[in-house]
Amino acid sequence: MRKGILGKKIGMTQVFDETGRAIPVTVIQAGPCVVIRKKETSTDGYDAVQVGFEPVKERKVNKPLLGYFNKAGVTPFRYIREFRLENSGEYQVGQEIKADVFSPGEKVDVTGISKGKGFAGGIKRHGFHRGPMEHGSKYHRRPGSLAAKGPARVFKGRRLPGHLGAVRVTVQGLEVVRNDPERNLLLIKGSVPGPRHGLLVIKNSVKGG
């Protein structure tokens, strides 16, 4: 059964299992999310639910979006995302989705916007090997040849220096170590994309497990 929740990255810490082994975990404020709209195959062509996360004041929302929230009968939210679910009929508008939607031991996929690193060269951005560093060498960190003389142009997709980070990244197959529905917290093994307080989309893993 497909399911998902929105959250914010709080930071990293460690917990200990029953054998005393330290496990690095990311602490995520997961929800509460509120169902804003249900979509069904009969009316929309597919099954899905739209959820809102992080309530905001009405004055911070534009009029079209405020009308959308008023029609649903819910308070305005900063973030709206849609999850495609085969069981969308089980949800009701206004229903809360909390951190207990995922249980310890479940595998999840976490999507976020990676940290922006600004302009970066080929070594940092793509892992290129550098040139000789000894005295007399005039080739250290440059990318080298870009193309052959024949085409007389650079092909699309060539790895070059440029902007690094600030892109959508999904990390698959992370394990839920612990959940705390009372404080809306999820502890997920390992690291997840993005900075602290960055928005995360958490869904059960497409690879199962």
Curated annotation (Swiss-Prot):
GO terms for biological process: translation. One of its GO terms (cellular component) is cytosolic large ribosomal subunit. Gene3D superfamilies: 3.30.160.810, Translation factors. One of its GO terms (molecular function) is rRNA binding. Keywords: Ribonucleoprotein, Ribosomal protein, RNA-binding, rRNA-binding. One of the primary rRNA binding proteins, it binds directly near the 3'-end of the 23S rRNA, where it nucleates assembly of the 50S subunit. Part of the 50S ribosomal subunit. Forms a cluster with proteins L14 and L19. HAMAP family: Ribosomal_uL3_B. Belongs to the universal ribosomal protein uL3 family. This is Large ribosomal subunit protein uL3. The gene is rplC.
